[in-house]
Amino acid sequence: TTELIRAIAQKFGVQVYNVLTGFKFIADIVRRNEDKGEFICGGEESYGFNVGQFVRDKDAPISCAMVAECAAWAAEQGKTLYQLMQDIYAEFGYYKESLTSLVRKGKAGVEEIAAIMADMRDNPPKELAGSPVTKVVDYNKPEETGLPKSNVLQFFNEAGDVVSVRPSGTEPKI
């Protein structure tokens, strides 16, 4: 989702768990760790977010309440939410994420998506944005990730960039 979460959590000594995409995986982490500490929040790349342990799924009302609370706190400091984000970037660095989807419909689309994933596994890129790839993580190999098997690949380069590739589980896209 974003490594900015990890950077902020690290400053405050808060444990971060990486899970597969989907709130069922976030809810599972909450369930398995209920007796070990407080769950603060969880989020995923589709902008779903959850705060606290009450609702173990995407929770738009609490997310809106948290944004309102952040805005109120920022106003008390004489700042806007934008200025607060600039403060965060100044302290932790700027993180940029983007999502690109390729839609491939029908049976031919399913086959093309499978072929793209197979090719990415067999012929991983040597560079990302001109920087050498230093690590490839294949989520089809639970022994590499400690997570359930999933059709996901991640490529890391020397510059610190990360590219994740996965077919959607609900739509005809990769």
Regions flagged by a language model, labelled:
Residues 172-174:
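Generic C-terminus detector
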Residues 1-169:
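Phosphate-binding and adjacent anionic-ligand microenvironments
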